[in-house]
UniProtKB/Swiss-Prot annotation:
Coiled coil segments of this chain: none
Protein name (database record): Large ribosomal subunit protein bL33
Gene Ontology BP terms: translation
Family as reported in the entry's similarity comment: Belongs to the bacterial ribosomal protein bL33 family.
Taxon lineage: Bacteria, Pseudomonadati, Chlorobiota, Chlorobiia, Chlorobiales
PANTHER family reported in the protein's UniProt record: 50S RIBOSOMAL PROTEIN L33, CHLOROPLASTIC, LARGE RIBOSOMAL SUBUNIT PROTEIN BL33C
Gene Ontology cellular component annotations, sorted alphabetically: cytoplasm; ribonucleoprotein complex; ribosome
A GO term, aspect molecular function: structural constituent of ribosome
UniProt-listed Gene3D superfamilies: Ribosomal protein L33 (2.20.28.120)
Alphabetical list of HAMAP family matching this protein: Ribosomal_bL33 (MF_00294)
Alphabetized UniProt keyword annotations: Ribonucleoprotein, Ribosomal protein
Amino acid sequence: MAKGKENRIIVTLECTEAKKEGKPVSRYTTTKNKKNTTERLILKKYNPNLKRHTEHKEIK
């Protein structure tokens, strides 16, 4: 029988550059496999408030 999806969790990514500039932060949600990716995710995503691609880090 197939195993369940207990290894995948939903995480929230928050813009780091908007915080430094004092502008509204953008947030994205995604999933990650907690067995394969134990450290926090860092992805480049589009921030509509800054109108450019910025670094988004995983928050709790």
